[in-house]
């Protein structure tokens, strides 16, 4: 069976739309009140995903290994998730608002080897509600975790397994591009691509297994409903731990090569929509 892989779509975009905008975050306001943006082109974003993939390969991240991302939407969320797809690993989204007990369950149940720690813009300024504080409380209960990556601007965790984003990217400097491409070439349609955890209304959340073929089938159905053209604006606000967030913001985004604008807080989505005009 032939399917369209998201990693191949990303590499295609890096070639066809190298200097076109892929992802933007608000950088501030100009003197006239207009918004200023920090933007990555498709080539820049693709290069970052390849760099993350190399770091994963350097630390022994194998086919089927899991990476949990405990953060709200931000550029590194997309590049880390993209790297799990590129290395034939498995992406596991963890809601940025999850309690320590909920985080422990999802990361432990998934058997995640790598954990990415970001921020929670809905913490209300309470440091105890930040992912780094919450994760630090349960790290010792997660024997499968081998590496904890602290994203820029996030409170560090004092633990031997915790490293900065910069140091993490340095890990893969000696890995060749060919090793990454070899991983992509080895992906089969029924290889596991993601674990999406349910809400856990009647018990502990359960990880729904989605393969590369599942994503391709979902994208084909979306194509029947809506057509998105290269370069059109899109606003990302739904948490990426949500299945629809992953479908559109990680997979459809690359397939259609649209220009994604990432909100800094889900509560600000209306303001972003007014400015971006998606």
Model-assigned labels for residue ranges:
Residues 23, 66, 72-100, 105-114, ...:
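A short helix-loop-beta submotif of the ANL/AMP-binding
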């Amino acid at each position: 069976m032939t399917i369209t892989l998201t990693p191949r779509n990303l590499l295609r975009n890096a070639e066809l739309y190298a200097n076109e905008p892929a992802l933007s975050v608000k950088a501030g306001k100009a003197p006239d009140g207009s918004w200023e943006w920090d933007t990555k082109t498709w080539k820049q974003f693709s290069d970052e995903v390849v760099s993350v993939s190399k770091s994963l390969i350097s630390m022994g991240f194998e086919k089927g290994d899991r990476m949990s991302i405990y953060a709200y939407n931000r550029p590194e969320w997309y590049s880390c998730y993209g790297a799990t797809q590129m290395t034939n690993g498995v992406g596991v989204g963890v809601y940025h608002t999850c309690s320590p007990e909920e985080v422990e369950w999802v990361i432990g149940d998934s058997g995640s080897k790598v954990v990415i720690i970001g921020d929670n813009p809905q913490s209300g300024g309470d440091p105890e509600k930040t992912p780094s504080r919450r994760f630090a409380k349960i790290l010792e209960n997660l024997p499968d975790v081998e590496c904890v990556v602290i994203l820029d601007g996030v409170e560090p965790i004092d633990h031997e397994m915790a490293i900065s984003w910069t140091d993490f990217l340095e890990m893969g400097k000696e890995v060749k591009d060919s090793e990454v491409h070899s991983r992509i070439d080895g992906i089969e349609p029924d290889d596991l691509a993601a674990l999406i955890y349910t809400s856990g209304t009647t018990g502990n959340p359960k990880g729904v297994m989605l393969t590369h073929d599942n994503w391709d089938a979902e994208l084909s159905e979306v194509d029947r409903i809506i057509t998105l053209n290269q370069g059109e604006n899109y606003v990302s606000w739904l948490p990426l731990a949500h299945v629809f967030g992953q479908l559109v913001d990680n997979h459809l985004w690359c397939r259609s090569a649209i220009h994604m604008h990432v909100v800094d807080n889900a509560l600000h989505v209306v303001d972003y929509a007014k400015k971006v005009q998606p």
